[in-house]
């Protein structure tokens, strides 16, 4: 399990764009399960939509990408790198995410060859599928 302090040591993202609150399980270099607690105080609900707050799908995908980044950085060979979003395939949304929901984020690295990685990802709320996709990343060194 990784708390927010450990997550910030791995990911360069910060408020308001850090979308992973806690990592609840890790299979080193392979799979990560994390959570994002969606509260009524999220900045994006001010405009999406004030009378009917729904988490933007692109931010659900970003939370999944960040979870994938944590999975990739668990490999010793990738320490000090960043996974840059390079593509997405088969993305489907099945359920809305609203204030009070807890997103369960799962990312499994399916391919890591050179500087390219792929992850199969899915987000659920209370067991209901929210989103699934395959995300591709280009690994790059973090600037010093």
Curated annotation (Swiss-Prot):
Name under which the protein is recorded: 3-hydroxyacyl-[acyl-carrier-protein] dehydratase FabZ
* Principal location: cytoplasm
What Gene Ontology cellular-component terms does the record carry?
cytoplasm; membrane
What CDD domains does this protein's entry cite?
A: FabZ
Native organism is Listeria welshimeri serovar 6b (strain ATCC 35897 / DSM 20650 / CCUG 15529 / CIP 8149 / NCTC 11857 / SLCC 5334 / V8)
Keyword Cytoplasm attributed: yes
Key words, A-Z = Cytoplasm, Lipid A biosynthesis, Lipid biosynthesis, Lipid metabolism, Lyase
Q: Which SUPFAM superfamilies match?
A: Thioesterase/thiol ester dehydrase-isomerase
User: Its catalytic activity?
Assistant: a (3R)-hydroxyacyl-[ACP] = a (2E)-enoyl-[ACP] + H2O
Q: Write down the EC number.
A: 4.2.1.59
Family membership: Belongs to the thioester dehydratase family. FabZ subfamily.
Q: What is the superkingdom listed in this entry's lineage?
A: Bacteria
Q: Its function?
A: Involved in unsaturated fatty acids biosynthesis. Catalyzes the dehydration of short chain beta-hydroxyacyl-ACPs and long chain saturated and unsaturated beta-hydroxyacyl-ACPs.
Q: Name one GO biological process term.
A: fatty acid biosynthetic process
Q: Where is the signal peptide?
A: none
Record: active site: 48
NCBIfam families the record matches? fabZ (TIGR01750), PRK00006.1 (NF000582)
Q: List the disulfide bonds.
A: none
Record-level Gene Ontology MF annotations: (3R)-hydroxyacyl-[acyl-carrier-protein] dehydratase activity
